[in-house]
Amino acid sequence: MRQVAFYGKGGIGKSTTQQNTAAALASMGYRLMVVGCDPKADCTRLLLRGVRQPSVLDTLRDVGPESVQLEKVVVQGYGGVKCVESGGPEPGVGCGGRGVITAIQTLETLGAYKDDLDYVFYDVLGDVVCGGFAMPIREGYAEEIYIVCSGEYMALFAANNICKGIKKFAERGYARLGGLVCNSRLVENEQALVKEFARRLNTKMIHFIPRSKDVQRAEINKKTVIDYDPDLPQAQEYRELARKIDENDEFTIPTPITQEELEDLMREYGIVD
């Protein structure tokens, strides 16, 4: 069983990319569980065709730890993907990252990881790897990490920050970086820029996902692209990303760059003057 964490700047399309990749792997015959590590509890929406499932934390609050059953918090979605949402604390009370810890520990207690799974995906909130949201890495669950980014400055800035956190954990023997996924925002020289950025981080751009309105069309219909229309070119892009992740055996300790180096890189590729 491979355990994979997806990180990335808020709004970059991380959850969309993760769910479409999960759907692609499921269509290839793999068995998956997706664990949404976001208090908004929207990391499995497309796999569940818009159905909002009860989160682990909401269920714990409603029935108490002793009465929680696995089938109450694990819902089957597209292609048999098992979907879980960690949820979060009540607004203004508690720590969202702590909620992730509680949710994953609950799943383990209930035996969710004993199922015959090929992959577990963790869809993790956060532009930085803070203590709670780093839990899938720190506790030895996630073994490989992919960062979703684009050629925009703030997306690369966030990716670099995430790499700083990963580096600390990787040096202690925890998860390694599997690569960057560029979710295109139609930035000038975007593909070349992200490739070079990845090289400087001691990793690779594992796939470049072109911008496509079909992603939005599928989302409006509450589906992944593969579920919406498996013959679309964009569906093939996600199948290709899934294949590359499945075949990937290059995992590294990242080498984050300075803010000045990032700004120089943006100038080099004509992104900023």
Swiss-Prot record:
Binding-site list for ATP: G8, K9, G10, G11, I12, G13, K14, S15
One GO-annotated biological process of the protein: nitrogen fixation
UniProt keyword list: 4Fe-4S, ADP-ribosylation, ATP-binding, Iron, Iron-sulfur, Metal-binding, Nitrogen fixation, Nucleotide-binding, Oxidoreductase
Entry's cofactor comment: Binds 1 [4Fe-4S] cluster per dimer.
Cofactor: [4Fe-4S] cluster
GO MF entry, a single one: 4 iron, 4 sulfur cluster binding
Catalytic reaction annotation: N2 + 8 reduced [2Fe-2S]-[ferredoxin] + 16 ATP + 16 H2O = H2 + 8 oxidized [2Fe-2S]-[ferredoxin] + 2 NH4(+) + 16 ADP + 16 phosphate + 6 H(+)
Chain positions recorded as [4Fe-4S] cluster binding sites: C95, C130
NCBIfam families: nifH
HAMAP family listed in its UniProt record: NifH (MF_00533)
Family: Belongs to the NifH/BchL/ChlL family.
Subunit structure as annotated in this protein's UniProt entry: Homodimer.
Designated name of the protein: Nitrogenase iron protein
Organism per entry: Roseiflexus castenholzii (strain DSM 13941 / HLO8)
